[in-house]
Amino acid sequence: METCNGLMRKNKRQKVSRNSDWSKLCPDVLRKIYETLRSPVDSHRAKIVCSNWYSVWKTCVKRPLCPLRIIHQGDSPTVGDGNRKLMGFSYNSYCMASSGNWLLMVDRCLKFYIYNLLTKERIDLPSMESKIRGGQVSFKSKSNNYNFGYLVGPSRKDDIVPYDYEAVEWKKSLAVLWVDETTGDYAVAWTFMRQYLFSYIKGDYSWCNLNHNGKSLVLFDMACENNKLYLLTMDHHIKIFNFYGDFLTGEQNLYPFNFVEDPSEYVWKRKIVIRRSGEVLIVLSLKKKVQNEEKLLFYIFKMNLESRKWERVYCIGDEMLIFGRGVTALALEDLDDGIKSNSIYFVGEDVWPDHQEHEHRVSNCGFFDIATSKIEWPKKIYCFINQNQWFVGGVAY
């Protein structure tokens, strides 16, 4: 039998256990825990434990900044060492774009949806085969073959554009996604064959055709941020669409981006990038011959509001630029595995494919140090979804 003193000690321990709240750890202890987490997934899971943990997370200076490489492997069960297999995706789905923790996915029959990589929430968008606002075009799929279809243009009989879901050209279509993590608002835009532009905003009943008067709109690139869609057109102008409820208003930059290449410079890609401040940048991926040697380079330009001319930018401060996403993110200090400020993150397809630099890389993702103009190819943890873009979890920006 337990003694009187033993019972008293047991009751005291039970009382202490009932009164202590394990989630209310000392803020200093929680900050130390957060600073040891390198993965955006682990950081996200920790911050949503309870309101107290989330409040402390917001005060952390060293929040994990860890861009992850996104690769699509279909239904393949094999994953290399150090790689992470993401569940919930099949061979039929393809990732078109990302924003924070969200991915823009498309299935056969042009079925679009957005998917939260961390919470697994899925939001289905209207079918592209349903009626499209702005009219004049429609999508049709071939019966009994969901890989093939066609777009019917304004002239109907003479304006039919076929597509193959598995074609490389199809998977290189421009697409952007913007999600406001606070309000839940979102906007999507994508181009069919880089000529027909469509958009969808939360609350719309259908997709909207942005090709006015049936004219094709050929683009170099586009970006979407804070309810604005930025287009870099083939005539080197920037066109901006503002999303306001059911209305779309457009404005055009009257000062085109005219970059004249030197005989030693060869541009591979042109990218429009929106900084955290809202400033618009244009980034060029190119190669340049220097003393009989070719170097892979990135040039950054911004508009001088006084001279109305585009000027080179040689520093982006404490930010890092995600080339595939067309945005910058805050990098408070240099982290391991090549994660550092004043750098441009890219994938193999973003630079010239015939360059000798590709022979020395240890992965298909790299970063360009703006200060030194040097490229490194760090070996990283990969997320298997899409082979041509970085995924940057929305945990620190």
Swiss-Prot record:
Residues 20-68 form the F-box domain. InterPro entries: F-box_BR-signaling (IPR050942), KIB1-4_b-propeller (IPR005174). This is Putative F-box protein At2g04810.
